[in-house]
Amino acid sequence: GIQSPLRGSDPHAIRALVEQDGGYYEGDLPLPRVKSDLAAFETSVRQTREAGATVARVVLAGGRRYERFKTRAEFDAFYVQARDILTRIEPILKRHRLKLAVENHKDLTSEELAAMMGALASEWIGVLVDTGNNLALLEEPQTTIERLAPFVLSVHLKDMCVQPDAEGFLLSETPLGTGFLNLKHLVAILVRSNPDIVLNLEMATRDPLRIPCLTDTYFATFPGRRETHLEAALVRVKAHPPNYPPPSVSGREPARILAEEEANNRDGFSWMRANLRT
């Protein structure tokens, strides 16, 4: 199956292809930002359902928390706006019977996202749990998964590796089974909470992401996190050196990058078939 925006594709053709091949389709929608966006959003919801989706992904912020927001007040205003938007679109989702999965996208901590979902208390809005993203917010992986599992509607399945860096650490996606996440255990937690979820493999072949958690600007939106999370995160990095060199793309030919990307994803599917049989 696939999780993707329609991007102008005929939704009925997508549905026919999925039904023919026996797969699945999950949508990917942009959130409306102002009231005048609601009509276009409802059209996208309707088309996503016509394509056969019962779940669609959204992200709340278009960037990483520690890069996009400079002050706590700025972040708080964004949080309130995001919660209000989800409240406003809930009747549209209910009308078309499409569930919306909000990804933990390096924007909200798992505590904040779980609190938002609890306040909404809607069967039509839940979480797309990305197994790796909250490492960028200094979280322990199992804690993240356990906190978000009650709301899970979809999954981005990743394995991750970490390396020390002068300003914090480097975070990389790595082929499933080669990183330090206990994926079988994390998946078991999620499936126990929602047996109907699908596991979407996400394996982007790119340069490591710098997590600048030794800088003051990183903590601008959650200053207390330096005291509560930093030491444990750095210990975790030191305790889990990469088992294999992480992917990188700088200075490499596009054709070689694409070949490695395909190989990494094929390896991921093979790992899933061998290790996640139900």
Where do the language-model regions lie?
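Flexible loop residues that form catalytic
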Residues: 6-7, 61, 160, 204
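Residues at structural and domain junctions
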Residues: 68, 75, 99-102, 130, ...
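The substrate-binding groove and active-site-proximal loops of carbohydrate-active enzymes
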Residues: 28-35, 72-76, 132-133, 173-178, ...
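Acidic-and-aromatic substrate-binding clefts and catalytic sites of carbohydrate-active enzymes
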Residues: 2-14, 31-39, 104-111, 133-139, ...
